[in-house]
Amino acid sequence: MRKSFFCAMVALLTLALTGCSEDWIEEQLAGCQASFIADAYGIGYSLKNENGDRTTTFKEGENIIFDVTIINSTGYELHLADERGILMGIMSVFRSDGEYVGNPFQSASTTSELRWITVEAHGRLHWSYPWIYDKRYAHDDRYDSSTSFSTKVLSPVAPLPKGAYYVMMKYKVMYHIVDNPTPGGGTKGSNDIELRIPFTVE
C-alpha cells in the first residue's frame, strides 16, 4: 500500500503549526481504514509589509504581502486538492463591515479534474504574493499536477485606502488513504472552520 495521504480542501487558512503521531498513521494504514488526521500538516499565514516584516498595520499606499507556508510534519507525502483556488481564497480582502473588496488575481480557473499540490515528507511549500502587482513577486506555480490548469494572473490593483479590513477563510480538510478498498473511498473530513485576520491601513 502506498504510504501517502490525500487532503481535499475547500479553502485554506490557519495560524496553527502542528504535528502528528506517525505510529497512529501506521496503525491506520495497516488496517486500511479512513483516516482523519487533523495534525498531519501545518499552515503558516501572515501579512507582511514591503520590508518583509510581519504586521497588521500598513501605511496608505504601502503594498501588502500575503505570505503562506504549508508544512508536512509527517514521514509521508501529503497531497492537497485545490478545488476552489487556495491562493485566491487566502488573499480575499473584506472591509470591517463585511463588504467584499477583492483579491489581486485577475482570473483563475481549473479543469473538471482535481488539481493536487504535493508536499514531500517533512517538507514545506512557500508562496508570497503582493496586493499591488510587483514583478519581484512574479507568479511561481509550484503545484505538482498531471492535470491542465489555466495560470492565475496577478492583476494591477490600486492600493487600499485608509480603513479597517480583514481577510477571512473558511476551510475543511478531508483525508483519504490511497488504494483504500473500502466502498465509497473511505474518506472522512472536518467541519467547516473559519478564521479572520484583521488589519488596518492608516
Region spans (language model):
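Sec-dependent bacterial lipoprotein signal peptides
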Residues: 1-18
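Asparagine-centered strand-capping/turn motif at beta-strand->loop junctions
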Residues: 70-74
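Extended, well-structured beta-strand/loop surface patches
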Residues: 89-164, 168-202
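Short, solvent-exposed loop/edge segments of extracellular or virion-exposed proteins
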Residues: 44-52
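Short, solvent-exposed loop/linker segments at the N-terminal edge
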Residues: 56-62
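Short, hydrophobic/aromatic beta-strand segments
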Residues: 76-84
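Bacterial Sec-dependent N-terminal signal peptides
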Residues: 15-43
